[in-house]
């Protein structure tokens, strides 16, 4: 319901997110310098809607401006933007003259959409896999050695001397 949406948005914005969110929202001057750091924006013909500021403007700023009073259709679209158009890499923060962490802002959108049950199913499944197995492939701890040995054998067709060190003290790990 729209009441549930409003309550959820306001709880996350006012209770969970706090001062950091407020500082970022009040500091951003919408200059667009963050855009040059966003690979998604750059790879989509520099569409302004896909710039970091554009994504936040279409999602979080609307929620703030409307004090949480947004439609379910709006929230569905916000979930798509937050889950598929930003991978939270934080490159935009490196380009922002004020150091605004747009990834944090988009993670707030993800949190809200998650609480409303709007996170895309494949992302929910991946998150569940991580919480259960600590990886996205449902590989259980006792299956890791066999899995890594299999990957090592497969990769040797391209890199003949490849070795994945298991239980080797001081091994370089990527």
Predicted features, each with a name:
Residues 2-30, 35-75:
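N-terminal cysteine/histidine-rich coordination modules
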Residues 16-18, 22-25, 57-174:
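Iron-sulfur-cluster electron-transfer modules
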């Amino acid at each position: 319901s729209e009441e549930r949406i409003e309550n959820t948005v306001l709880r996350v914005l006012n209770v969970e997110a706090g001062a950091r969110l407020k500082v970022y929202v009040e500091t951003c001057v919408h200059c667009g310098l963050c855009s040059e750091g966003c690979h998604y924006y750059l790879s989509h013909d520099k569409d302004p809607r896909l710039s970091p500021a554009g994504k936040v403007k279409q999602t979080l700023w609307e929620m703030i401006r409307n004090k949480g009073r947004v439609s379910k259709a709006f929230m569905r679209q916000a979930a798509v933007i937050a889950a598929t158009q930003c991978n939270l890499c934080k490159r935009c923060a490196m380009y922002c003259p004020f150091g605004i962490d747009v990834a944090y802002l988009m993670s707030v959108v993800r949190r809200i959409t998650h609480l409303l049950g709007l996170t895309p199913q494949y992302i929910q499944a991946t998150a569940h896999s991580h919480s259960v197995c600590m990886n996205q492939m449902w590989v259980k701890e006792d299956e890791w050695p066999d899995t890594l040995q299999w990957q090592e054998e497969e990769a040797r067709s391209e890199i003949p001397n490849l070795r994945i060190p298991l239980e080797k003290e001081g091994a370089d790990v990527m």
